[in-house]
Regions:
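Membrane-embedded alpha-helical bundles that constitute the cytochrome b-like, heme-associated redox core
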Residues: 1-139
Length: 139
């Protein structure tokens, strides 16, 4: 069995409840944010090195699939930031409170706060996407 399959089956097979899902979401959102930053730095460098490629990148970013990716990116940034603050708080200020019950409770709080911040932002972004790309809502 390949190491990737072994790793993925280990990640998905382990049933650590909230702590496990918190770890996985933190890892995935960090990778998503890092991927975006890498692509963003690369395409911004096109302004200097290849201006025509930069204009092509802008056209791609105006597409529907890129707009949906941006909605996902906003979730990644918000969750990764809030969960990182949660982890930093327990590591630096309240290490004695780092226990399974508090892990469960704070995971749900950080996920709920993420959704409370993300849903309005995603709604506005999707509204603008539908308006600008498909002419809906008087666009």
């Amino acid at each position: 069995m390949s190491s990737i399959v072994t790793t993925l089956s280990g990640y998905l097979g382990y049933r650590g409840r909230e702590g496990h899902w918190s770890f996985l979401l933190h890892r995935i959102t960090g990778l998503g944010t890092g991927l975006f930053l890498t692509i963003h730095i690369l395409d911004t460098s096109f302004v200097y090195f290849a201006p025509s490629l930069y204009m092509e990148a802008i056209k791609i970013y105006q597409s529907t699939i890129a707009g949906l990716g941006e909605v996902g990116l906003v979730f990644c940034v918000i969750y990764h930031g809030l969960n990182g603050l949660r982890i930093a708080y327990f590591d630096m200020f309240a290490p004695k409170n780092w226990a399974i019950p508090s892990e469960r409770k704070t995971f749900w709080w950080s996920l709920g706060l993420t959704l409370a911040l993300w849903i309005p932002a995603a709604s506005i972004m999707l509204f603008n996407l539908l308006k600008n790309n498909y002419g809906l809502f008087g666009g």
